[in-house]
Amino acid sequence: VRRLVGSEMCIRDRFIGDTDLLEENNVHPDILLEGMVDEPYVLTKEGKKIRCLSNVCTHRGTIVCENATKTKNLVCGYHGRQYHIDGKMKFMPEFEDVENFPSESDNLPRIEMDQWGKMIFIINNKKCEIGELIGPMIERLSWLPIEEFKYNPELSRIYNVKANWALYCDNYLEGFHIPFVHKDLNQTLEYDEYFTEGIDNTVLQIGIGKDNENTFDLPKNHQDYGKNVAAYYFFLFPNMMFNFYPWGLSVNVVKPKSPEETQIEYFTYVWKEELMEKGAGSGLDKVELEDEEIVESVQKGIKSKAYDRGRYSPKREIGVHYFHRLIQKYY
């Protein structure tokens, strides 16, 4: 488990941002998990249609689009090959005598993608349908106005952890450590009512508040109605975390850099700014640093020859056990 790294792990579905990336421009390039998967892609928008295309020229492999822009065509800067905004080959100089040109293979390949509201996911491997992966999240939170959530780059972060990616996920997948590691967070949550379940490649954890302040105003027909839900934590296997609070959403993407180094990208989406520093969704920087400290301690400890492995708490480590089963299933 702990040695899975790079493309061996992060080859499935990936959150890459939201439709606001194409609000001013109709072309937005990026690289899928740079340093691991290293797949150049470009999002394009034609009318209301959003596509994800390979950003590699089918002629000689050059990156086609270097910057977000507004354009009618995609043009390779190496030899001038042009593509329509939908990726189809449009024009290539000095190719008049080439037989069977252009063909399907000269178009920019499409990369499968899907959306939940404004959220965009790349489907990089068909081991699991995106609908299956985010289905439990959509079902539980379909009432939330995701379209109103606004990305805030100033509140977004990148953290570097000196520990294996799986250890970081292990820690995220249980609330067992909250009373011991997160003293402030523990003051806001009812520890005995903390809920965890594994559903279809997803782990859901629900934090229940000690009072009804700073909790979700749930619809009367919702399955959690009547509970003081302070946070919904969704883990989408193998490396995405969607944390919903009354103020909005924090998306965390786990990026293994080496067997003992992990990078965590935080994407912050604000819904109700006035609730930002209240309840379970407050002090997220502090909570993250507390998690990093304990996970780095585990990384040091598991190197000991005296340590083999521990057993699972059937009550408190449901998510960790489910995560390990999914790794065995897919890898």
Question: How should these model regions be labeled?
Answer:
Residues 1-6, 10-11:
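Single conserved hydrophobic/aromatic residue that forms the stacking wall/gate
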Residues 12-14, 62, 177:
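Generic structural signal for secondary-structure transition and capping sites
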Residues 1, 19, 61, 80, ...:
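Generic secondary-structure boundary/loop-capping signal
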Residues 23-126, 135-138:
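Rieske [2Fe-2S] iron-sulfur-binding domain
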Residues 12-15, 23-24, 92-97, 234-238:
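Short Pro/Gly-enriched beta-strand edge/turn motifs at strand-loop
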Residues 16-18, 66:
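General beta-strand structural signal in soluble alpha/beta enzymes
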Residues 23, 44, 55, 114, ...:
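C-terminal catalytic domain of Rieske-type non-heme iron oxygenases
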